[in-house]
């Protein structure tokens, strides 16, 4: 397959230097495929841009932090009491909440821009070389649209198993317009996602182009990315054989990172990253960035004062020999002492643990970072202002996706093999001999641990139909009591049917102008959506 030479200039910093969309006509932007590639590259920039004039709203990173991690069971923001409602998932039924708005706004912005590219796609050209370029442009835009609808469905639609696809889906816009439009079903949403990805895969294969091989071009979509999106979409849809097929295809050209790469800060693409959000000091979003909220090394107060901490419940099942544990400040029982005296999320201001972390993690945290038990240093900023790339897909996720699908199909030996392949690079003595429910728990434990901080926790729990279980220090965990109340309405421990079945209502930014959509989902007695 040929490298995508026609976008070499567009892949440099100059691709950011575009006139505002409203000031450039479609005739200019889509004059030819080379020009259209700049518009495609702009989709990548949308994924790392500040939105709604709100600190912390940075595109893809916001979804990972605010939706995937803070409400989950893997990471808590040390003593960040002001974010209790976000951390406990108490905003799902608030159609005016900005955290509900931002994800809808961001992904539909991506969809609209992808649709603009697709609306201007040129076909039937006599110039074969130019047609192949246009086909590559279209394939990339289709991937962005399919990915956006996949991610939206995880938040704004119920679990696939709740109604086998007959629950409410999304507003499926496939062209640039402002027409009123009703919601689809979830099944119709995934029919579009599959159709877009099938066409993208076909075009990627036939056009003969690929993104440059440099790892710093992993922000560009290609055939592997299309397969990765397919894997995640099929996992949400419980389409197990499809998960297996596309997980294997997606990771074919990638290998698990080494222990040293794993500990290097997760801020730069490497051999394992399939797709990324690109950000560096030439185009930072400063205090709005993902790193300002999910690292312990940024100079912003959200990072220094309230660093992320991995839950003790996530660490405990992992073999102590696993080299990935080194990026977390895990205390010994002696360092913790009397748990009844632990403050909140585990803040420490002096003593043996404090001194050890300050010394051992000096290069991984900011000089004035507040120290907590189980402090996470997985993400390390490239510079103090908060810049750094973010993995969207890694080979490891594809292996966990496949393992989950294999388990659902009863292929337990395949699950054990996949687990060993993901763990042995970090613990050479690891073997998996478990079966049945114990194997399922082992798979979930290593998935949670490996993908920690990367935006999966809450989405995984929702898909599995698992309850939110947060144990306080007194209960053998490490959660602050204000994040772990036993209250299914507003607390931090609740079941899969609570809190609107973990489903966000459609925000008023849609319902205020689209009268065909309501932020109240009517459910029939059989669990399906009442479209009337």
PLM region spans:
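Membrane-proximal, proline-rich intrinsically disordered regions
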Residues: 11-65, 247, 314-320, 329, ...
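Short, surface-exposed recognition loops and adjoining beta-strand edges that mediate ligand/DNA contacts
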Residues: 26-27, 54-72, 77, 158-166, ...
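Hydrophobic-face positions in mid-chain alpha helices that act as interaction patches
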Residues: 38, 244-395, 440, 450, ...
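Conserved, well-structured interaction surfaces
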Residues: 80-155, 184, 202-204, 384-390, ...
